[in-house]
Amino acid sequence: MRNVRRVAVGATPSGFMGSRRKAALGAPVLNLMCGTALVAGLTFCVQDAWAQDWVPELQAATGETHGRNDPIVIILPDDLDPAVYPRLAVELDDIDVTAFAVTAPGQLTLNPPEALSTGEHVVRLVERGEDGSIVERGAWFLEVRHSELIRDLSVRADLAGEVNARVLDGGIDTPPQHVTAESGGNLEAAAGDENWRVSLQGNYLYNSQLELGLNERNIDLGEYRLDGDYENEDFFAGLTAGNHDTGIESLIMSGFNRRGVSVRAGTADERISATGFMLRTESIVGTRHVLGISHDEDRIEGGSISVRPIEALKDNILLTGIYYNGEGSDGGFGIGTDEVINDGDGWSVAADTLWFDEALRVRGEFAEATFDFDGKDTGFAPETANAYSVLASLEPLRGSTLGGSTFNWTFGAQREQVDTFFQSLANPSLQADRETTSVFTDFFWDEFAAQLRVDHQLSNVDDFDFLPTDRTVNAYFNGTYTPFVEPLEDGSLPWFGQPFFGLTASVTDIERVETSSDFPEDDADNQSRSLTLSTGSNYATWSWNLSHTLYTFEDQTGFSSDSINNTTGLSAYILIDDWLTLSPNVQYDVFEDRDLLKTSRTINAGLSADITVIPETLTASLNYNLNVRTGDGDTPDSSSFGGEVVWTLREPDANKLGVALAFNGFLQETRNDDFESLEDDVQYQAFTTLRLSLPVSY
């Protein structure tokens, strides 16, 4: 074991701003750092005879701050023996970077191979002894900043565009322009310091064909999001503008990603937090409504507050209240025109609790919503309805292991009731008029995973005579098994590879418990069942996957035909060589109408190939698809062939434009011998393309 001697460092390193650290690391910090790549695992001993006591210093930054690309200069004593220089090594963030250091009389200059990230870095200088021992001469914290005001600054963008020239076509309607262009890109920018951060995300779309452009414009903004956050030891605050989801999840507001503005604030320990929002009701993109909240008739506003009332149980009990009101035209009952404006409001209160080391979760929520279905200030009065949800889940063996592997098992129950006329502008996808009781369990252990859920649902919650009452029972199961396979002595897999197995099954039973007074003859009694079996295996250079799905539908009322559907699919991925990969697939489908005694069969087959002619320069991709239908209700067969050849003139790299030329096209043939069709049997197109791409990074 080599010996290491640690020399006391008494120098004062420079290069830190304001009240940043101004001294070399003392003994406690050095003890913390000693587990690095150069020092870890080595023992300490008394001072070696070859080692001299000398102290280096870190040179101050030449400007106001130490920039990302600035060299790191370590000042060496003037009287240091030049024979020591070859024995010096530099470490940056636990990585030996001596190869990038240059020594000169009185100093050592490190030029990092790439720009340093902003933030705090650790620089360490060590001296190697002839006997293999190591002396740590100095260690410093170095803060890298963009400027005195901004510590972190980054800009990233992925820009891509292409110009297409149609050189060949037939049997298909084509636009008059033979040369078209399109482009798209994503942008991310961020700036911040220790307590604050501002970030921007956005994208754009361009199309030379006006009719295909976003909002009938050649170029326009897609979606964007602007965030600003501040946090200190006592509180946090933030603002978001653009397309975003406030993160509020409740019966009256869920998954509501819209354009608008929201603010948030709370205590640093998150015992109290609040969110206020003003969002557009409909989803929009583009620059026509930049903030999205300019129209009163298409906007909701409100807020939420969350409290952890008991300090001793602040991680266990969370109380949340939400309120909103507004107007919009997507109420969810087929109302989607500008002429009909629905208004509504709603509120909810919820309690979410965790017990027994978070093994038991109990959550309850009650909500009330008012909604004017036939339009604001017209027709009938608004409807007010309620909804509630109760959830309990238990993970009895939380954190346990079985056979040396993590074992997770969760089971629970949920009760949810949503009144017949419950409707929220901020949660338009919520299914109303249902009373649902569910039980579920999730299981994961080593090679096994399974999920099981059973739902019992009743409709016509408010017992209206003019509505029927239906009972729906749904059961769902999904399970996977991936056994561990020990590689052979040569590192390869056995003949059966790395197999995997899966099973998915579902059953849905719908029964009409009580008919409506308006349509007493209408009945409902049907069952649908689905079973999917899948298996496959992975090898070093290829893989395969086989699946079969059986679906049956039975209608006891005779309103719909009983049917059976069998679908079998087989696919593979084969790496023939470094220059060729093949992806074949075939699917066989049989559909039987048991009432009409008709059967139809469909075969879909395909083959894709990726070819590398010259690595990173010339590539090609080809694909062939065949669709054959037989039996009752026979329809035309079709086949298609497509492909592309790409010649890369210059690979895209950070802040460097990538250029490529491509030739692509397709040919489709439809066999219409027994059918009359307005379209040609053979359709084809071919293009030459110039592609440009530019990844930007700063």
Language-model segments: residues:
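N-terminal secretory signal peptides that target proteins for export/translocation
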Residues: 1-26
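Short, compositionally biased P/S/T/A/G/V-rich stretches that sit at domain boundaries
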Residues: 49-68
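Short edge beta-strand/loop segments characteristic of extracellular beta-sandwich folds
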Residues: 71-79
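Solvent-exposed loop/turn segments flanking beta-strands in beta-repeat/beta-sandwich domains
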Residues: 80-88
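Aromatic sugar-binding surface patches on proteins
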Residues: 103-110
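Surface-exposed, short loops/turns at beta-strand junctions within beta-sandwich domains
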Residues: 113-120
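Outer-membrane beta-barrel channel domains
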Residues: 120, 126-129, 136-538, 543-555, ...
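Outer-membrane beta-barrel "beta-signal"
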Residues: 682-698
